[in-house]
Amino acid sequence: LALLALPLASPAFAQPATDPAFDAAFANFTRARQGDAAQLDAAVTTFQATPGNPAMKPVYAAYLGSAYTLRGKAAWMPWNKMKYTDKGLDAIDQALAELRPEHDRLLVQGVPASLATRLVAAATFVAVPDGLFHRRAAGKSLLAEMRRSPLLAAAPAGFRAELDAVEARLKEAEK
């Protein structure tokens, strides 16, 4: 019985998710993350939309949450910084809670949706000030979980490099 279940979990049977709306939002998010604040509102708006594929919901929620934390970082007023960051962290918590085994088989830009969601969460948790939001330990735990995942071996090199970069940021933050 276990042998019959094994092929279904292999990357060869993974379902690629093609979602032009996600690709556009991801491009906006990437530019916003690199400092182009004008792209942030577009990313938030697109990630707020219901994905065409309902299985993509955790991925959308994780990126929406991360975009909100970027909005918090860019806000001028302290209460807005807190409001947006808290809203973002709540969205990420929801995304992580929605992950199911089928997200291991759904590919988003060549990466299992479960890994993509966890990396966005971990990167965000490591980036927010730990003295205020107390998320560094959760980020560290997610990074360790991804390192132990058998799915990581089949993930694209770019994804693994991003994981390495988040781990390096964590080590720097812990100094």
PLM segments and residue spans:
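Structural signature of tandem alpha-helical TPR/SEL1-like repeats
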Residues: Y84-K87, R135-S141
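N-terminal alpha-helical interaction modules that lie
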Residues: A14-R71, A75-L107, E145-K175
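Short acidic, glycine/proline-enriched loop segments that cap or flank alpha-helices
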Residues: V108-Q109, F133
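Bacterial N-terminal signal peptides
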Residues: L1-A9
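Short N-proximal segments of mature Sec-exported proteins
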Residues: Y63-R71, A116-V128
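Hydrophobic, well-ordered secondary-structure segments
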Residues: L119, K140-L143
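Outer-membrane beta-barrel transmembrane domain signature
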Residues: V128-H134
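Amphipathic alpha-helical protein-interaction segments enriched in hydrophobic
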Residues: G110-V120, A161
